[in-house]
Amino acid sequence: MTLILTKNQVLHCQFSSWYSLFRKLTPKAKVIKPIPATVLKYLHEDSIYVEQPMNTVEEVDSEEDEESAPAYYPEREAIQLIEKAIKELGGAVVPKLNWSTPKDALWITTTGSLKCTTAEEVLLLLKSSDFVAHDLNHAFDDCKDFDNADGSVPKDFSFELVLKEWFPMHASTEFRCFVKSKRLIAFCQRDDNYYEFLKENIDCYEKLISDLLKKLDTFPDPDFVFDVYIHKDRAWLIDINPFYPRTDGLLFSWSELESMNSENMKPEIRLIPKGSMPSTGSAKYYTNRVPFDMIAASEGENLLEFAQKWQDLTNKSNE
């Protein structure tokens, strides 16, 4: 089987496309679409800027001041729109763009969590993520039917800001599930640590995942990958991705997934085996991280204080 990726497959996997179909199967969320133009411009900027309190902003009245003016930041109306959505979702959210959650930007947090309680935290996480940058610039890479030869996203494409209600998730019961011809061919745990209880409960998890898949029968593509979180005998739909190597196969290679027969009665199940080296998560997304001196600058600071300190250090180095 030779895998082919199309533009429609990618579009079907953007959050707003499937959330409208499966709203009752997934945690509560709000979609701001189109994303405010000033937010989109901020995400495309090269530098990271943290908003200053209104009473500290000085009027730029000279050429020298203009040269040292802070980098671009979204308008107040856009900030208020995000703050309103956060409040409506209970005061804490997990942000994402059309496809990607900024999991690779956890290095900029002091909590190791995607939990955001302010618009500034939302924007800083999105701005610091290579995954989000890929959404912005290369979402249609590898699509055989996409016109732009370099895979770049059209300028008139409608990006969306997704804010998902935050709640604590135990990584041990997150699974990635692979579907071919509408059949569950395989699934595996997402976390890379061994959990003894998973094996004894795996039959129950398989049934919950299979039951959830039946409710996804209106998804337009026969082949896709979906993520679930199992909690208290319920499988929650977390995300949907294309059945294509750009989606991480985790404990499966894509050559294995391509060769699996969708007619098999039982899906292939893989868990981290006992005796595997425990993971602290420190190596995950290692290449997305930053020099040690930037991390050292964050000691004792919250997210925004850390970013402001790093901005000050960067400005001094450029003097």
Curated annotation (Swiss-Prot):
UniProt feature coiled coil, ranges: none
Main location: cytoplasm
Binding site for ATP: 96, 99, 101, 103, 164-167, 174, 176, 190, 227, 239, 241
Gene Ontology terms: biological process: eukaryotic translation initiation factor 2 complex assembly
Pfam family, one: D123
Record's keyword terms, sorted: ATP-binding, Chaperone, Cytoplasm, Magnesium, Metal-binding, Nucleotide-binding
GO molecular function annotation: ATP binding; magnesium ion binding; protein folding chaperone
Localization in the cell: Cytoplasm
TM spans (from-to): none
Binding residues annotated for Mg(2+), in chain numbering: 239, 241
Database matches in PANTHER family: CELL DIVISION CYCLE PROTEIN 123 HOMOLOG (PTHR15323:SF6), D123 PROTEIN (PTHR15323)
Protein name: Translation initiation factor eIF2 assembly protein
Annotated organism of origin: Schizosaccharomyces pombe (strain 972 / ATCC 24843)
Gene name of this polypeptide: cdc123
